[in-house]
Curated annotation (Swiss-Prot):
Oligomer status and interactors: Interacts with TSG101 (via the C-terminal domain). Interacts with RILPL1 (via the N-terminal domain); which recruits ESCRT-II to the endosome membranes. Interacts with 14-3-3 proteins. Component of the endosomal sorting complex required for transport II (ESCRT-II), composed of SNF8, VPS25 and VPS36. SNF8 is essential for the stability of the ESCRT-II complex. ESCRT-II interacts with ELL.
Protein family (similarity comment): Belongs to the SNF8 family.
Compartments, as annotated in UniProt: Cytoplasm; Endosome membrane; Nucleus; Late endosome membrane
Main location (coarse class): cytoplasm
Family annotation (Pfam families): EAP30
InterPro entries in alphabetical order: ESCRT-2_cplx_Snf8, Snf8/Vps36, WH-like_DNA-bd_sf, WH_DNA-bd_sf
Transport among keywords: yes
Domain of life: Eukaryota
CC terms in the record's Gene Ontology section: cytoplasm; cytosol; endosome membrane; ESCRT II complex; late endosome membrane; membrane; nucleoplasm; nucleus
Identification of the protein by name: Vacuolar-sorting protein SNF8
């Protein structure tokens, strides 16, 4: 049986229908976008009212501050943005994180000769709290991380390295690649690492392990102990817990503030 070809009229009708569907889809998308924008504006207004009402608690309570920061992040608001915008004027968070950043730099500089420019987040938190005094605004580890990220954005050499269940804060512009990072993670348990331990745990060749350790020594991030039993131990002072309890001495403070 002979099939009839599709006529010009049918083609035109089909194109017209497609155009109408496309137009309708565009209208629906625009309506949906307008509705989402309206909801976002309403959420932002409610967030501003919430911040105004609870600003004292946001300033004083670290846990409350974290929750507020997370609420802001859901709509792309950055309360830490510099400048004299609504958030910095209302909450004073711009000044808070600027001052915290300065204090972080002071602590890292004072302890650099001990740890080579690497410090655990826990020790940094401990030293910052000691420096602030008991009447100062409380600070959480989350606050420290946010302040460090701001410092990192300024190109100051600061970085955050995940190690086990915590972080190492890097305050010197040393080049650390993935090999260096995994060795730091391996040393987290005992505070030191050996060539044999690296080879056994990471399945590396001897030369690769030695290159990484030599780099850490060169950058001042590791100490070499040739008197250790068995073979040389490479200590990571940032992970050497006996140093944590030592407060910043007057001499160390003078190195930062001559």
């Amino acid at each position: 049986m002979h099939r009839r070809g599709v006529g010009a009229g049918a083609i035109a009708k089909k194109k017209l229908a497609e155009a109408k569907y496309k137009e309708r889809g565009t209208v629906l998308a625009e309506d949906q976008l307008a509705q989402m924008s309206k909801q976002l504006d309403m959420f932002k207004t409610n967030l501003e009212e919430f911040a105004s009402k609870h600003k004292q608690e946001i300033r004083k309570n670290p846990e409350f501050r974290v929750q507020f920061q997370d609420m802001c992040a859901t709509i792309g608001v950055d309360p830490l943005a510099s400048g004299k915008g609504f958030w910095s004027e209302m909450l004073g968070v711009g000044d808070f994180y600027y001052e915290l950043g300065v204090q972080i730099i002071e602590v890292c500089l004072a302890l650099k000769h001990r740890n080579g420019g690497l410090i655990t987040l826990e020790e940094l938190h401990q030293q910052v709290l000691k420096g602030r005094g008991k009447f100062a605004q409380d600070v959480s580890q989350d606050d420290l991380i946010r302040a460090i990220k701001k410092l990192k954005a300024l190109g100051t050499g600061f970085g955050i390295i995940p190690v086990g269940g915590t972080y190492l804060i890097q305050s010197v512009p040393a080049e650390l690649n993935m090999d260096h990072t995994v060795v730091l993670q391996l040393a987290e348990k005992n505070g030191y690492v050996t060539v044999s331990e690296i080879k056994a745990s990471l399945k590396w060749e001897t030369e690769r392990a030695r290159q990484v350790l030599e780099h850490l020594l060169k950058e001042g991030l590791a100490w070499l102990d040739l008197q250790a039993p068995g073979e040389a131990h490479y200590w990571l002072p940032a992970l050497f817990t006996d140093l944590y309890s030592q407060e910043i001495s007057a001499e160390e403070a003078k190195e930062v503030f001559p």
